[in-house]
Regions:
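Ankyrin-repeat intra-repeat helix-capping/turn positions
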Residues: 88, 115, 159, 198-199, ...
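Short coil/turn connectors between adjacent alpha-helices in alpha-solenoid helical repeat scaffolds
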Residues: 148-162, 195-200, 297-298, 382-389, ...
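Ankyrin repeat domain, specifically the short helix-to-loop turn at the C-terminus of the second helix
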Residues: 94-102, 122-130, 162-174, 205-213, ...
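Leucine-rich solenoid repeat scaffolds
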Residues: 314-339, 447-450, 459-506
Length: 513
């Protein structure tokens, strides 16, 4: 049952008391939805803001208005439906619409995202400006493009396209965009929403055919993540230019030789690397041969890159591609560079790391973490998702390489192991003392990071996020009361519901999800 406004106000006061008492979980809740810049004293309104954001509203005034207009219970279910459509949580969509078939009534953005052509036509018949009016953070075209409802109702594709045509006829733009978040104005295009976010090739093709810009700085890069080449081919066909982008480097993350071939044929240059921070984040990729080294690219990929002109003499953060190949254990690349006579000498620290990578006996050797080059400081986090790296990781830990240090995004190896759905490594990091209270740079805890990975990790189908979640729960992590309802994976939702019932002592109000 949804809490009343008065109860939520009391929750805000309780959160403030806990925050001012420096309780870890209260601090995490505020950090997950920061109402003000760091170190700015917080007021009562700021804690109301956190309570509203945890309830999936943009602000306390937005929550209060929704409660006054239609009742808090219905408003809360509408917010949950919006999230479910955006994330593609089919079982949540089904339950909400089965329980309340008219839940989208009066919510134009929801009606667009649900491909309700009849309702949208009715609204536009009396209010043509509705087609271009921003609703929340998104215009109607972005509500349509970022909806993953097509995977829940694929037979509604014709209605989806008819709705897109209707919006366009009433003034909407195929080049509409939306900010990443309320506090981050980096823009994500409707085309990215359709192709990169929603994996909706039907709508992506329609947008491109009607003039969407294929060079939006996001779509081509993220099209390499989808596990197929339809998006990459579609974008290249409509003029996407891979030169100067990191799309080729991202395709290497997935060992996708075919995508790399397509991008090279379209003009991609293997020595291109754009280190510009996007939306406040550093790139997830690095120059091609260094990328090949740390991703353990195989012979076909290495030969393809070298044939296309990748420079073995290129350095990144002061380290050669050859050193990377040895340190990360990619002997295929190391041999290829040696064959070209371009193998520089390794530093003493690199020799120790290379020995650990090759399976050599590290004996009593230890690395002073303070002397570890920055390029290798996060090596455990960088390799843990790769097959067969468990023993390598243990040798690195034995050498003294930090196993619980956060990277630039605040992600620790434990968080990444949980996100990747790797229970053996999740358990290993917990057993050797990783910090269970750590909150990463995205505001996530270990539990919320596992839930996020269960819906977003590209390899989630063959991973085991449920076992990672059990490991975290058995270690005693706090469980937000709404976690079972927030989980997008029905298996994890049921697991959490059962755990909450059997372990009420771990249940907490609010918190990152």
């Amino acid at each position: 049952m949804t809490k009343s406004l008065d109860q939520l106000r009391r929750d805000a006061k309780a959160l403030r008391r806990a925050y001012e008492a420096d309780e870890i979980y209260a601090r995490q809740r505020v950090a997950n939805h920061p109402p003000r810049p760091d170190d700015t004293p917080l007021k009562h309104a700021d804690f109301l803001h956190v309570i509203a954001r945890e309830a999936q509203f943009e602000s306390w005034p937005a929550l209060k208005l929704a409660a006054e207009l239609q009742g808090l219970d219905r408003a809360a279910r509408q917010q949950r439906l919006k999230t479910a459509i955006f994330q593609g949580q089919s079982h949540v969509i089904e339950k909400l619409l089965t329980d309340t078939p008219d839940l989208a009534e009066g919510q134009f953005g929801l009606q667009v995202a649900l491909y309700d052509l009849v309702a949208v036509k009715a609204v536009l018949a009396v209010d043509q400006q509705a087609a271009v009016r921003t609703l929340g953070l998104r215009t109607p075209m972005c509500h349509l493009a970022f909806s993953r409802y097509i995977h829940h109702q694929p037979d509604r594709a014709d209605d989806m396209i008819a709705l897109a045509e209707l919006l366009l006829a009433h003034g909407a733009s195929v080049n509409d965009s939306m900010p990443v978040a309320p506090d981050n104005d980096h823009q994500l295009s409707a085309l990215y929403g359709a192709i990169g976010h929603a994996n909706n090739m039907i709508l992506g093709q329609w947008l491109l055919e009607h003039g969407a810009d294929p060079n939006d700085g996001e779509s081509l890069y993220h099209a390499t993540e989808l596990g197929h080449h339809e998006g990459v081919r579609l974008l290249l066909k409509h003029g996407a230019d891979p030169r100067g982008t990191n799309a080729l480097l991202r395709a290497m993350d997935f060992h996708d030789v075919e995508a790399v071939r397509l991008l090279l044929a379209a003009g991609a240059r293997p020595n291109d690397f754009d280190g510009t921070h996007v939306g406040g984040e550093r790139p997830w990729v690095i120059p091609a041969l260094h990328q090949a080294a740390r991703r353990m690219s195989g012979r076909e990929m290495v030969e393809l890159l070298l044939a296309a002109g990748a420079d073995p003499a290129d350095t990144y953060e002061g380290h050669s591609a050859y050193a990377y190949a040895r340190v990360f254990g990619n002997q295929v690349l190391a041999d290829a560079i040696e064959a070209k006579g371009a193998a520089p000498r390794l530093s003493p620290v690199e020799e120790m790391l290379a020995n650990a990578a090759s399976g050599g006996d590290i004996g009593g050797a230890r690395i002073d973490p303070a002397q570890l080059p920055g390029a290798y400081r996060d090596i455990i986090r960088m390799i843990l998702h790769l097959p067969g790296k468990g023993d390598h990781i243990k040798r690195l830990v034995g050498l003294g390489v930090p196993f619980d240090a956060p990277d630039a995004e605040g992600l620790t190896p434990l968080h990444v192991a949980g996100w990747e759905g790797l229970p053996e490594l999740t358990t290993y990091f917990i057993e050797i003392g990783a910090n269970l209270d750590h909150q990463n740079g995205y505001g996530g805890t270990l539990l919320s990071t596992i839930l996020h990975g269960s819906e977003n990790c590209p390899q989630r189908a063959e991973r085991d996020h449920a076992a990672c979640l059990v490991a975290a729960l058995q270690a005693g992590v706090p469980v937000p009361r709404r976690a079972p309802d927030a989980a997008g994976d029905p298996v994890l939702a049921d697991l959490l519901a059962d755990w909450v019932h059997r372990h009420p002592e771990q249940v907490v109000d609010g918190g990152p999800l």
